[in-house]
Curated annotation (Swiss-Prot):
Record-stated family: Belongs to the CinA family.
Pfam families given in the database record: CinA, CinA_KH, MoCF_biosynth
PANTHER family per UniProt: NICOTINAMIDE-NUCLEOTIDE AMIDOHYDROLASE PNCC (PTHR13939), NMN AMIDOHYDROLASE-LIKE PROTEIN YFAY (PTHR13939:SF0)
Record's protein name: CinA-like protein
Lineage summary: Bacteria, Bacillati, Cyanobacteriota, Cyanophyceae, Synechococcales
InterPro entries per the UniProt record, alphabetical: CinA, CinA-like_C, CinA_C, CinA_KH, Competence-induced_CinA, MoaB/Mog-like_dom_sf, MoaB/Mog_dom
Source organism, top-level taxon: Bacteria
UniProt xrefs under HAMAP family: CinA_B
Length: 417
């Protein structure tokens, strides 16, 4: 007895994905959208531009899933084989669609091009398939039910085209088919200064919840907790999330710095704006990483004045006015020099706050007293200075140390504001 088809799966097509030449952002985006729509999503796959293996993947999906979403392989080149392979899998002929052909000609004409044989291929669709229009590109997709209880939706691999087609046509179609049962909502909380294991231990009872669910994961110093709830309506799902979020924030205390799209940099910038204050940075081992994190956010210039990458001791002296005797006595990687750098940045750039980072990022340059992974941080503000020392160790390498240092510098400032 065969198992009834259920749920949805995503199949991303392209040899470039298998080779790691590009990241598979389409699968992630579609998975999030399916979750928000309340459509059960059980599997994801990646297959190269090979018709035999693609056909095997399609038939496997047809044996177990109600809905297959394919991205990629709809272009005009010979290795774009998605449509042809789908038709062959189910023994259906391709037919040239006059409406698709006219749309292709119009789009190419607007770009000063004529319709060639390669583009004409994009007007060939399986008999009985519904066109899934592409408002921004030339490659149309299809909505096709080749077997009772099994539907395929195809999209180009270009993310902007795929997203426009999904939102404008696919989602309304899915809703009309009553495939959308209720809705999911999620909330992502961000924590800094805790390990994933320690936070998971602190919130252990909440990790056992079923609706909403709470799932932890870590990313270079930051720990995230995603709360996901299902409800008949968005408001009911959000109502289920609210008390759990409140409890997680209470447990996390000052380690919880934001939610959803917040970052340490965005939170710090907002804190500075609310106080009508400004910031300057002085960096050594991070090489501009703190400034880069801040300027990655549009509009940061209203509070972030700038910074000095003081890698050499001479620059620390000349631009930040760190005393030469202090450098000789304490060394560049020290609490005293970090404090002098923060004060120098604040004074020289005329800001309300100064942040400094100096450390040994490795792999060389360490000593018994100042090993690789030792980093000193300082924040200078209207009411004085604060200092933080971290010993990251050398197991994970230079980039890891520098990345954590950027986060710890911003977090130290956040806690002072």
């Amino acid at each position: 007895m065969s198992t009834p088809r259920s749920g949805c799966e995503i199949l991303c097509i392209g040899t470039e994905l298998l080779l790691g030449n590009i990241l598979n952002g389409n699968a992630r985006w579609l998975a999030e959208s399916l979750a928000s729509l309340g459509i059960p999503h059980f599997r994801q796959g990646v297959v190269g531009d090979n018709p035999e293996r693609l056909g095997e993947a399609v038939l496997e999906a047809a044996s177990r899933s109600r809905l297959l979403i394919c991205t990629g392989g709809l272009g005009p080149t010979p290795d774009d084989l998605t449509t042809e392979t789908l038709a062959a899998c189910f023994g259906v002929a391709l037919e040239e669609r006059a409406d698709v052909l006219a749309d292709l000609e119009a789009k190419l004409r607007a770009r000063g091009r004529s319709l060639g044989s390669s583009n004409r291929k994009q007007a060939l669709l399986p008999q009985g398939a519904e066109v899934l229009p592409n408002p921004t590109g030339t490659a149309p997709g299809i909505i096709w039910t080749p077997q009772p209880g099994f539907t395929v939706l195809t999209f180009p691999g270009v993310p902007s085209e795929m997203r426009a087609m999904w939102q404008q046509t696919a989602v309304p179609w899915l809703q009309a088919q009553h495939l959308v049962a209720g809705t999911f909502r999620s909330r992502l909380l961000h924590f800094w200064g805790l390990s994933e294991s320690s936070l998971a231990e602190s919130v252990a009872p909440l990790l056992e919840l079923q609706n909403p669910t709470v799932a932890p994961y870590a990313c270079q110093g930051e720990v995230k907790l995603r709360i996901t709830a299902h409800g008949a309506t968005a408001s009911k799902a959000e109502a289920a999330i609210a008390p759990v979020e409140q409890e997680l924030r209470r447990i996390g205390g000052e380690h919880c710095f934001g939610a959803d799209d917040d970052s340490l940099a965005s939170v710090v910038l907002q804190q500075l704006r609310s106080r009508n204050q400004t910031l300057a940075v002085a960096e050594s081992c991070t090489g501009g990483g703190v400034g880069s994190a801040l300027t990655a956010i549009s509009g940061s210039s209203d509070v972030f004045l700038g910074g000095v990458i003081a890698y050499a001791n001479r620059i620390k002296q000349d631009l930040l006015q760190v005393p030469s005797k202090l450098l000789e006595r304490e060394g560049a990687v020290s609490a005293a020099v970090a404090t002098a750098m923060a004060e120098g940045a604040r004074r020289q750039l005329g800001s309300d706050w100064g942040v400094a980072v100096t450390g040994v990022a490795g792999p060389g340059g360490g000593s018994d007293s100042k090993p690789v992974g030792l980093v000193h941080f300082a924040v200078a503000g209207p009411d004085g200075c604060s200092h933080l020392e971290r010993r990251y160790g050398d197991r994970r390498g230079r980039d890891w140390i520098r990345g954590l240092s950027v986060g710890d510098a911003l977090n130290l400032l956040r806690l002072q504001l």
